[in-house]
Amino acid sequence: MVALLPGLAALLAGCNEDTVEKQIGSATAASVEATYRVNRDPLLNDWNQDVGRTLTAFSVRQQVPYKFKVVDTDMVNAFAAPWGYVYVTQGFLDFADSEDEVVAVLGHEIGHVVHRDGIKAFKQSILFNLAAGLIGSQSETLGEVTAVGLGLLSLHYSREQEYAADDTGTAMAYAAGYDPQGLLGFFAKLHTDLEKGQSSSYLEALLSTHPYTPNRRDRQAAQPWVMAATAPSAMRIAQGYLGRGQYGRALALLNAKAAQEPDNQQLALMLADALAGRGSESEARGRYQMASAQGAPSYPNYALAQMTKNPVPVSVPPTAGEQAQALALVGSAEALVTGTQDTQTRLAAAQEAMAPKLQAARGDSAAAMGLLQRLSEVETELPKQTQKIAININAAVAAAADVVYTLDRCQEQSVTAVQNNAEVGRQATVLLRSLSQGGSRSGALKLAQSAVYELGKSNELLLAASEAARAAVGPTQEAQMSARQTSMYVERLFDRQRVRQSDLTLAQMLTRETRERAQAANKQAQEAQNRARLATVRGMLAVLQLAHAAAPAEMLPGLDRMVAHYLRTGTGQVAALRDRGFGYGDIAVMVAAARGSGTAIGLEADRMGAGIAPLEVVDLKRDGSNGLKVMVKFLSKAMAQEVALPGQASNPAG
């Protein structure tokens, strides 16, 4: 076990456990934020903080001032420092498919805080001494500061601690009105990756510190609140879906229980609310009237009055001019589908050509990253000079590994994006054909045309990202080779009997070289990743525009509510912009731009003007594009579950 520094022993003297945890947590948080850039996008951070506050309202440790932040690394991870500092990585947000997945994982990390797992793990590690040095102002280098933050990512939790955190995470998600099956969805993604037998590099940290096993998934699947086994549990989750404008998801849950409890009036009223939200006015009225006649008229009568006051819109068939324009655009959409297939072929060929060098880089990175685990599990107190050098090596090797994570994520993201573009292109073609024959509704043409345009721009960006990635592979491989060579000196540093001054000098020189190579490679890898990320955003904007076009007019008020939830704005604001002719994808860009610049959303709308692709006008900074990608991903996936897209066999929301 690590021997405590004299300064730490003095620090702990007379302190209660909360005081120690608070001081260690504060020092660790400072280390994390010195190591990784914190995302400052207002839209993303408001959402992250809102979700965190909603969950921690159900924490049994209310004395902890929880804070939630996003850090900029393509590594897939989420972690909690002592005293409620909860971090998710940009890579994790890119990897997660839904808001419910993120909520459940955030709840899991809050569970580690609730059970004090972080401080327990720190006490088993050299990091406890390092954090104490920060508290006592004994730190002399940035390396010492960053080591604690990097070390936090390599702390290991026991199987029992992971089980308990899973329980807390799903229970909190359920209590907050989210679907706790989000954790099962996240586990399913991990399981799929592991089944491939080639776990991606960017998952290594998550799988190392939070070991996944099928038992974790099966254990949560057996929890009654996770599977909505009873009417009350289904109703609680459905209420959350109603509040987020996901009326189809709510209906699916409620319909499954309605036959079991036909006399449950609260369930019947929630069903009516869900039907009203989806624009099924006649059926909703019938259920409200039935509930009113059964002796509880107050709410049903209010709901009926609101429906009379705010009737649902009625779809108007496309005009003859719109039909003719749609027919003319079918050829463009078909050409887009062919072009997307060509893009897929070119991306696959480029990735195959890069594979040998990238695989070699992964191997060198994996070997070098063994240092992180070595540092977290060391059971001896190192001399101060040796400790500092080991810390700096740790930081340099981690920086080099980050470049591999970035290129791996760029490739994965590009493959997924081009596959989605191909499917959305086919759906746009089907919708345009329908419009040309008098199907769909008036106003859908402009939205479908916008979707085709965004898909074309997305394909262009994917090819540019591929070219940038190709240029980054060589520098990335050089950085990993340097990191591996540097890490070879770790064993000598930990052996106090063998270490010589010449070893320390050489280790410092190699560390400097690794850091410089990592910085150069990272600059090129980030260029590729930023293009792939923007390509993904444009593909998702196409989904939103197409879903808006495909939705019957009566569904639009309900979809306004969904958009407002994810964009953290008012339903009335969304409806007003929609009435001005903007699509849901347009509105997402406007809101992100307004939040990032501090201007009014209406002013952004005036500046952009109807008919102009917003991303051709808006210059989103890096944070803004990352935040927009996350929120648009969750929104587009939720909307695609509500709206039957053209060419889709059936509406998955029911």
Regions picked out by a protein language model, each given a short descriptive name:
Residues 1-7:
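Sec-dependent N-terminal signal peptides
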Residues 2, 12-314, 318:
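A Zn2+-metalloprotease active-site environment signal
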Residues 19-28, 122-156, 198-204, 333, ...:
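Glycine- and small hydrophobic-rich membrane-insertion segments that are intrinsically disordered
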Residues 211-232, 293-338, 515, 519-527, ...:
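Pro/Ala/Gly-rich low-complexity, hydrophilic intrinsically disordered segments
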Residues 245-246, 279, 321, 363, ...:
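Short helix-adjacent coil turns
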Residues 309-539:
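Extended amphipathic alpha-helical heptad-repeat regions
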Residues 502-506, 510, 519-654:
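General marker for long, soluble alpha-helical cores
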